[in-house]
């Protein structure tokens, strides 16, 4: 949904669907998948990533990343685009590192990857991947796991998730790595701000 989220009376509101659609930035952040695909095709893009959150039953403790690419798990179908799996794999360790560190605990896939072809996972290609550019959709966490949803409301946490994808992209292209670090964590004491 629209980001950055705005607090109302010190809390983040739970919008009804109608209220959500009436937000000023709704159209900006909720474009048709066909529009996104047209933009990808028209702009000579060489790396596509679509960042999302996943859903299960509200209040669940299910929480893990899922990378989905066009094609099949065996990377042998005519639908597969060369480089899809490799791009996912380059980012997996960095994204999964956030979860295995305990900052955003993972309920599954701690010791193995979760990189899947849409053809096997869903039986069809997701609308946002119906273009001819190599890349993937990533479900970084489950927003129905309440701690993950609240972390996603924090711009610093979103920056950290973005850094994970950035580092994977740098690895994929073999580019020079950054030479600075980031100190990230959580404060669990009301007296320390």
Report each predicted region and the residues it spans:
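Active-site-proximal helix/loop segments of hydrolytic enzymes
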Residues: 1-180
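Structural motif
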Residues: 186-193
